[in-house]
Amino acid sequence: MSTHRFKPSYDESESEDDYLGSVLDNKDESDDDFSSLSFGALNSAQKKLREQSETQRPPSRKSSKNQESDDSDSDSDDQFFEDKKSKKTKDKKSKRSKHAPAEASFKRPVPKIREIPGLKSAKDSTLYTDIRFDAAYGKADLNRVRKDYAFLDELRQKEIAEMKAVLKNDKLRRKMSQREIEDLELQVKSLQSRLDTLKNRDLSTKIISDHKKQQMEKMKKGEQVNPYYLKKSEQRKMIQKAKFETMKASQREKVMERKRKRKLGREFRQLEFREPQR
């Protein structure tokens, strides 16, 4: 029995593209249907199939794998930094101790004068200093300073007089507590002793300067060839004599009594430690 192959027939009015589409859509037909097509139609059919496959193709595994790897890398990085931070905080918490030494960065050089918490630093001590009395500018001339600030003695004297008037006033004393009265008495004593020391210093400088003037006058007159410089012991004697002359009778008695007691105490100490004679 002879088998005849029938070629697919189509109208000439139909375009080649329509026929190509019908052939491509008919998937059940055999490969013999494509034998009737020209090379140009086959080429266009191949292009069409490629376009369809590209549009219908799912996203590539590589891109998904790359994305997954990126996500996993970012997650792992975050986890790594979080672990590092947690480790650091744990180490800090574990290392912090009351008796642990203070930590300092090794990148900065250690200062020569180390600041210790709780102690006054060098900056604080030299922050509010008077440059007139700074050692960098040489020794201060005490005689000149005393002359420049002599007016402060009058202010101190007035302050002492006011404090004494408050202590003598009974009404004001009743309003004050015992501690306030004692503090006021101490202030009066400290101010008075400061004034006395300044007066004694002025007296000693005056005595020494007067002695120098006398020596210079004697040298000018020709009575003396070289000046005579006083020793420390001689200076003390002259100053003591001048003090006694300026003192009142009651003050002299107090000074003499103090000296007598001091002398007696010295004698008793010598008697205690003296070995008995055999």
Curated annotation (Swiss-Prot):
Bias type Acidic residues, positions: 69-80
Swiss-Prot/TrEMBL keywords: Coiled coil, Nucleus, Ribonucleoprotein, Ribosome biogenesis, rRNA processing
A GO biological-process term: maturation of SSU-rRNA from tricistronic rRNA transcript (SSU-rRNA, 5.8S rRNA, LSU-rRNA)
GO (cellular component) term, any one: nucleolus
Biased composition (Basic residues): 86-99
The keyword Phosphoprotein is assigned to this record: no
Coiled-coil annotated residue ranges, if any: 165-204
Keyword match Nuclease: no
Annotated region (Disordered), positions in chain: 1-118
Compartments it resides in: Nucleus, Nucleolus
Main location: nucleus
PANTHER family the record matches: RIBOSOMAL RNA PROCESSING PROTEIN 36 HOMOLOG (PTHR21738:SF0)
Family: Belongs to the RRP36 family.
Subunit: Associates with 90S and pre-40S pre-ribosomal particles.
Record function comment: Component of the 90S pre-ribosome involved in the maturation of rRNAs. Required for early cleavages of the pre-RNAs in the 40S ribosomal subunit maturation pathway.
Protein name: rRNA biogenesis protein RRP36
Organism, as annotated: Clavispora lusitaniae (strain ATCC 42720)
Gene that encodes the chain: RRP36
